[in-house]
Design a protein with these regions (language model features):
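Amphipathic alpha-helical
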Residues: 194-224, 260-302, 447-479, 703-732
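Residue patterns forming the tRNA-binding/recognition surfaces of aminoacyl-tRNA synthetases
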Residues: 4, 12-13, 17-21, 91-241, ...
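Conserved oxyanion/phosphate-binding beta-strand-loop segments in alpha/beta enzyme cores
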Residues: 1-36, 66-75, 99-106, 281-320, ...
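Catalytic alpha/beta core of large soluble enzyme barrels
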Residues: 58, 71, 263-362, 367-368, ...
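Helix-rich, typically C-terminal accessory recognition domains appended to large enzymatic cores
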Residues: 79, 144-160, 410-441, 496, ...
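Alpha-helical recognition segments enriched in aromatics with Gly/Pro capping
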Residues: 306-312, 316-329, 476-613
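Basic, alpha-helical terminal appendages of large translation-related enzymes
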Residues: 1-21, 25-32, 260-263, 272-275, ...
Length: 803
């Protein structure tokens, strides 16, 4: 009798073997396939079963490609700078460097439990000076190309993390990292001009084999729109206010203007009578987040006391401030057409501002408007020379007319804002800029990089708008690289996204001290073929990575401008009732105990079995027991049958090729949960066949190779048991023969007038006349009327219509 399945002994044996004899070796002859995980930030809580899901999916795909003859680039590293690592260190009362090193050690141990074919020789760590030397090098190159610049501006401010945040880091008005309500703070910031790439970032989405959902999210974030900028003169002053509108055809209906409270003219426009109210309103608005301001709450506002002149008709329009207008979108000022915009209508009604309808269905004005008329088209009314025109046509013509009149210009606008790139924290890459009183902002010479992060005693955020680095005088004070005079270093640090925007390029040449990546290796191994990670990074990391890749392509470092050919977003594994796993909620399931009790192979397969991989799934620990029982049955089947010497008959061949077809098709479609259920079904089928007449060696070996990417340890053990000395991963993925899969006989349904009256077994290739004759025999005396029609759907149904 065969030895029972002992997962502990088998997994220990093969892990040791793989360390000594790696299965994924670059022999220089195979084509490359680059399969990449989104690298983790080393949190203190370690990995839970949700993290495992993505890593298992990527390893299954990598091993599948290995069996298809590729050299697989499958690296791993650490996204270790930034707020998560620093906040954890502060909470634990340790230096972030020390806590980060300890966390990496623990998570690396946990990742190795997965038995993924990671190439640890390629490992990168964003906090390693030899890595962030190149993060700084990229920022210097961007500065020299005019893509990095300083600006005093109101930014998103997290009062808990005590740092500025990019728009992309604010979710529903809260800090993406700590959940605190985000406010606004006016600070000097470093910005990256991602807007210079807006058109390319949008257009090139069409090139990507990515989920449509992600491409749509990026397209909406970039938010391209066409319209016009229109200049309104301020009555009695030399100032002009420019607004951006996508509906220049409604200009005659603009009865007031609204400025963002942060607009540069906001305070200046206040009169003596309104100044106190205006300044109080500006202050209150500064305490709100952008999301709070944009929500559908009752609109607030304050009249400045000043008026602008509508350039199309000379009408005086009052200038208001309201926090529903944001300084960083468009021009920070809008013209308001209350008759045709719900928000403007609500505002006008509240503050008793005139409402002039300029678009009407059939050209008829609505008496006593109760709501805005927001239909996309209609006939122009109350619009001077534009009366009688079709509004949708005028919308296209108006920008040109406005340009010819000299009151504005045709414009394309984007929701995308330049990237706030500085953080007022310690744990990040120092920004390699020196501030000189004479020369201004000057980059640190490239040959002096990396500019290393100094050791500090006190690294907690200050909350003053200055980073803790500002207190280290012997580090801050330096000489200007251009003129040699006394100067000061930039004390803000880069955001966490700086290193993660390009790390995938470094893996393949991580020990190169002369270049970010050699062009030879870049041409040979890049870009990434498959990127696997959570959809929560759709806008942040994925957009930033595309921006960095395009920039590095433009300066000749690489010759491709999109980083990731294919993207797969796995769903989240949640606790009970769909609640996200977190230490604070006490619902984290650690993989460590499950690996001990059931084995790595069982956990790998259960991670795939819980549901479609692209959807969220609720963790139910009882399910892993069923997967473990399946592996036990599979092991027993192989061990019992391996020496029987059975010859393959037609039925065994059919099952073998159907097995190959189903597993391969489901795997290629990323229907990984049905791959596991398929293995279970076919194991039951083969077990039943084994009891009758046995299973041949080739079918057993085929099943082992197919299982290998999913459960590598048991596959290696069984491959060896079949008498092989080489690795199961040195084999070639099996191919199916469609002819061998065909059924000899099929069962069909026999109907009279569409109602089932019996069933019939026929030959798969049997002709129509023969099938109809047999069907009539089955029906017998049930055929008691006049036959009107005989219908045969090959291999499925006979339907006889009688009266």
């Amino acid at each position: 009798m065969a030895t029972p399945y002992n997962h502990k002994a088998i997994e220990q044996k093969w892990r040791k073997h793989w360390q000594e004899h790696p299965v994924n070796v670059n022999d220089g002859k195979k084509p490359k396939y680059y399969c990449l995980d989104m690298f983790p930030y080393p949190s203190g809580s370690g990995l839970h079963v949700g993290h495992w899901r993505g890593y298992v999916i990527s390893d299954v795909w990598s091993r599948y490609k290995l069996l298809n003859g590729y050299y697989v680039i499958h690296p791993m590293g650490w996204d270790a700078f930034g707020l998560p690592a620093e906040n954890y260190a502060i909470k634990m009362g340790t230096h972030p460097r020390i806590s980060t090193e300890a966390n990496i050690k623990n998570i690396k141990r946990q990742i190795n439990e997965i038995s993924a074919i990671y190439d640890w020789d390629m490992e990168v760590n964003t906090t390693d000076p030899e890595f962030y030397k190149w993060t700084q090098w990229i920022s210097v190159k961007m500065f020299k190309k005019g893509l990095a610049y300083e600006k005093q501006m109101p930014i998103n401010w997290c009062p808990s993390c005590k740092t500025g945040l990019a728009n992309e880091e604010v979710v529903n008005g809260k800090c993406e990292r700590c959940g605190a309500d985000v406010t606004k703070k006016n600070l000097r910031q470093w910005m990256l001009k991602i807007t210079a790439y807006a058109d390319r970032l949008l257009a090139d989405l069409d090139k990507l084999d990515w989920p449509e959902k992600v491409k749509k999210m990026q397209a909406e974030w970039i938010g391209k729109s066409h319209g016009a900028e229109v200049n309104f003169k301020v009555d009695g002053r030399d100032d002009e206010i420019t607004v951006y509108t996508t509906r220049p055809d409604t200009l005659h209906g603009a009865t007031f203007m609204v400025l963002a409270p942060e607009h540069e003219l906001a305070k200046d426009l206040a009169t003596d009578e309104t100044r106190e109210a205006v300044e109080e309103y500006i202050y209150q608005a500064s305490l709100k987040s952008s999301v709070d301001r944009m929500q559908d709450k009752e609109k607030t506002g304050v009249f400045t006391g000043s008026y602008a002149i509508n350039p199309i008709n000379g009408a005086k329009v009052p200038i208001w401030l309201s926090d529903y207008v944001l300084a960083d979108y468009g021009t920070g000022a809008i013209m308001c057409v209350p008759a045709h915009d719900d928000r403007d209508f609500e505002f006008a009604k509240k503050f008793d501002i005139p409402i002039i309808q300029v678009i009407a269905k059939d050209g008829k004005e609505i008496e006593n408007m109760e709501e805005a008329y927001t239909e996309a088209s209609g006939i122009m009314i109350n619009s001077g020379d534009w009366n009688g025109k079709e509004s949708s046509e005028l919308k296209e013509e108006a920008p040109k007319i406005i340009e010819e009149m000299g009151i504005g210009k045709k414009t394309t606008n984007y929701k995308l804002r330049d990237w706030v790139f500085s953080r007022q924290r310690y744990w990040g890459e120092p920004i390699p800029i020196v501030h000189c009183p004479d020369c201004g902002a000057v980059p640190v010479p490239e040959e002096e990089l990396p500019l290393t992060l100094p050791e500090v005693e006190k690294y907690e955020p200050t909350g003053t708008g200055e980073s803790p680095l500002a207190d280290i005088e012997d580090w801050v004070n330096c000489k200007c690289p251009v003129c040699g005079k006394d100067a000061k270093r930039e004390t803000n640090t880069m955001p966490q996204w700086a290193g993660s925007s390009w790390y995938f390029l470094r893996y393949i040449d991580n020990k190169n001290n002369e270049e970010l990546v050699s062009r030879e290796k870049a041409d040979k191994y890049l870009p990434v073929d498959m990127y696997i990670g959570g959809v929560e990074h759709a806008v942040l990391h994925l957009l930033y990575s595309r921006f960095y890749t395009k920039f590095l392509c433009d300066i000749g470092v690489i010759d491709f401008d999109e980083p990731f050919h294919k993207l797969f977003n796995q769903g989240m594994i949640t606790g009970k009732n769909g609640i996200k796993m977190s230490k604070s909620k006490g619902n984290v399931v650690s993989p460590d105990d499950l690996v001990r009790d059931y084995g790595c192979d069982s956990l790998r397969m259960y991670e795939l079995f819980v549901g479609p991989p692209e959807l969220d799934a609720e963790w139910d620990e009882s399910g892993i027991d069923g997967v473990h029982r399946f592996l036990t049955r599979f092991y027993k089947l192989i061990m019992d049958q391996k020496d029987k010497g059975v010859e393959a008959d037609k039925e065994l061949l059919k099952v073998r090729h159907k097995l190959i077809y189903d597993i391969t098709t489901r795997l290629n479609n990323f229907s990984l949960n049905t791959v596991v259920s398929g293995f279970m079904e076919y194991t039951n089928t083969l077990t039943a066949m084994a009891k009758k007449s046995g299973v041949d060696k080739e079918t057993l070996e085929t099943a082992i190779v197919l299982l290998a990417p999913f459960a590598p340890h048991i596959a290696e053990e069984l491959w060896e048991a079949m008498g092989h000395e080489d690795s199961v991963f040195a084999q070639t993925w099996p191919t199916y023969d469609e002819e061998a899969m065909k059924e000899d006989e099929v069962e069909i349904v026999v109907q009279i007038n569409g109602k089932v009256k019996g069933k019939l077994v026929i030959g798969a290739e049997e002709d129509k006349d023969s099938v109809l004759a047999k069907a009539k025999e089955v029906l017998g005396d049930k055929l008691n009327g006049n036959i009107v029609k005989e219908i045969y759907v090959p291999g499925r149904i006979v339907n006889i219509v009688q009266k």
